[in-house]
A protein has these predicted regions:
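Residue-level markers of secondary-structure register and packing in elongated scaffolds
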Residues: 1-10, 36-95, 133-193, 200, ...
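Extended, non-globular alpha-helical segments
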Residues: 206-216
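A surface-exposed, glycine/aromatic-enriched loop/edge motif typical of exported proteins
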Residues: 86-115, 235
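Extracellular beta-strand-rich, repetitive "passenger/adhesive" scaffolds
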Residues: 20-24
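Short polybasic amphipathic segments
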Residues: 25-27, 126-127, 196-202, 219-221
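Extracellular, surface-exposed repeat architectures
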Residues: 110-128
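Short loop/turn segments immediately following beta-strands, especially the blade-tip
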Residues: 14-18, 118
Length: 273
């Protein structure tokens, strides 16, 4: 037995008020937390509130994300981070700048990443990050980025990565799906597939078995014999996991691009996501 994990949704009213609805989620409630979403007139998310803090998003007239005010992102300090983004005429990001969190005018930059696209024939190919050149093979696979060197096979199948003190190798099955990863720092990880779904993972003394829901998203992970359920946000990021009693055991935070920025909770170090 155990506690059922329930996610409840409400939606924005449609053109006829409470007699109609839209596909836009207004609130999403799970594991005791309610997230409230706001949108602009084109359906872009402009705010996500958990009842304590709100992450806000700003877009330009082309719908490009140009600013994020995130009180949970600690890049610029424990009080949060405001990110400002600049793009070229082709929509490629050119600059990503972090400031101390504010919803008003920003102060001095804390961090700035710059992106260059200098290939005359491939206008949106990233050729340098923060002044460090990125090289590619003839079909566009990266070969080096200033830190890692990459090896490829069968077109776009990555076979290995190497940097100072670390080497990673990958193996695949006949369908081209990854079945093994071996790294200097973490040893060997084996992946057991059912069709295209990962159903079992073995990593040292860690064993994980995965079950999927009707939308083919991971719903349950059995970690070393104990079951945990996945929690998702509206953007389909895994934001946490709960145990059989419905208690939150791990929580994940992401940036606006879906990249993880922090992990907390009792299972933070277990890599069950």
């Amino acid at each position: 037995g155990g506690t059922a994990v329930t996610t409840a949704y409400t939606y924005l009213d449609g053109a006829y008020g409470s007699n109609s609805t839209t596909p836009l989620v207004r609130t999403m409630t799970q594991a005791g937390t309610e997230l409230t979403y706001t949108y602009d007139e084109t359906g872009n998310i402009t705010g996500i509130s958990d009842g304590q803090q709100e992450i806000t998003y700003v877009y330009d007239l082309l719908g490009q994300l140009i600013r994020v005010n995130d009180p949970y992102d600690t890049t610029a300090g424990t009080a949060g981070t405001t990110w400002v983004f600049a793009y070229d005429h082709g929509g490629n990001i050119q600059q990503k700048t972090a400031y101390a969190y504010t919803t008003g005018s920003v102060g001095a930059a804390v961090k700035c990443d710059t992106f260059a696209y200098t290939d005359a024939n491939w206008k949106d190919k990233l050729t340098a990050l923060n002044g460090v050149n990125i090289t590619y093979d003839e079909i566009g696979n990266p070969l080096s980025d200033g830190t890692w060197q990459y090896k490829w096979a069968q077109g776009r199948q990555i076979r290995g990565m190497q940097k100072s003190g670390e080497e990673v190798a990958f193996a695949y099955n006949a369908d081209g799906l990854r079945v093994q990863k071996t790294a200097t720092s973490t040893g060997t990880t084996k992946y057991i597939m059912h069709g295209r779904n990962l159903v079992h993972l073995i990593r040292g003394d860690e064993n994980l078995h995965f079950f999927y829901d009707a939308q083919n998203k991971p719903a349950i992970a059995i970690y070393n014999g104990t079951a945990y359920a996945y929690l998702y946000n509206q953007q389909d990021d895994v934001v946490g996991m709960v145990d059989s009693e419905g208690q939150l055991v791990v929580k994940y935070q992401y940036d606006a691009w879906g990249q993880p920025i922090s992990t907390g909770g009792a299972l933070a170090e277990t890599r069950v996501r």
